[in-house]
Amino acid sequence: MNFELTEEMKMLKDMAYRFAVSEIKPVSQECDEHEKYLPEIRKKAAQNGLVGAWIPEQYGGSGAGILGNTIITEEISKIDMGISLNVVASGFGCESILNYGTEEQKKAYLPGICSGEKVCAGAYTEPNAGTDVAGYKTRAVKDGKDYIINGNKMFITNGTVCDFMVAQCITNPEEKKHNSFSLIIVPADAKGITRNKIHGKMGIRASDTAEIAFEDVRVPQTNLVGKEGQGFRQL
């Protein structure tokens, strides 16, 4: 079996590294030292097809797949891990939208990621549970045609710079844990959301990391990703 990269992937690898050297290296030290997030780098990367590369072309991506996205991540990270995350993780959380969302959700959220104009956050980790998905406590309770969300998320990548987030919430508390969670799209500017940037990280400081609090945050039930009660598996 031939494991060598195709010529197209080799070109992608070279282009990603050259982009990192020309656009990221000059500001790397400053961004790391001062915890600075530069959206213009993300937008320039998007113009070169480096953002949301794993997303199919029909939704605005370059269609490079997981392998192509991995190559981009490796090459940019050689220069700076933090700024690399700003580029390749700007769609973090959208994997669930692509895999389980409705066609309307895909068309509404994915193109903006690929163009570099929008940023998503995966609002999963919680203070009490870390990345133990079964231990999350954030609740989403139905009220009419909406969900009302209450809870806290911690160490959320893109937390203060995102335009929307995909949040893991308990929607079916009466079910066993693996059947109790759902993924819900939440606009970052929704009333009741508080976002606080986490300062003083030991590394990857150019990447935005935040604590997010939900207090009676109301979103329509149409923002449910996939099926209710399937969030544990989808994540």
Please report, for each region that a protein language model flagged, where it lies by residue:
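Amphipathic, small/basic residue-rich leader segments at the start of a protein or domain
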Residues: M1-L85, A108, G112-S115, V119
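Short Ser/Thr-interspersed hydrophobic loop/turn segments at strand-loop and sheet-helix junctions
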Residues: G49, I72-S77, Q168-C169, V186-K191, ...
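A glycine-rich, basic-preceded beta-loop-alpha segment at the flavin cofactor/substrate interface
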Residues: L67-G68, A188-H199, D208-L235
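N-terminal glycine-rich flavin-associated loop
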Residues: M81-E104, G130-V133
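Short Gly/Pro-enriched turn/cap motifs at secondary-structure boundaries
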Residues: N86-V88, N128-T131, F155-N158, E174-E175, ...
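A short, Trp-centered hydrophobic/proline-enriched beta-strand micro-motif
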Residues: G116-T125, Q168
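A structural signal for short hydrophobic beta-strand segments in well-ordered beta-sheet cores
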Residues: T138-V141
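A short core secondary-structure module
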Residues: D146, N150-R195
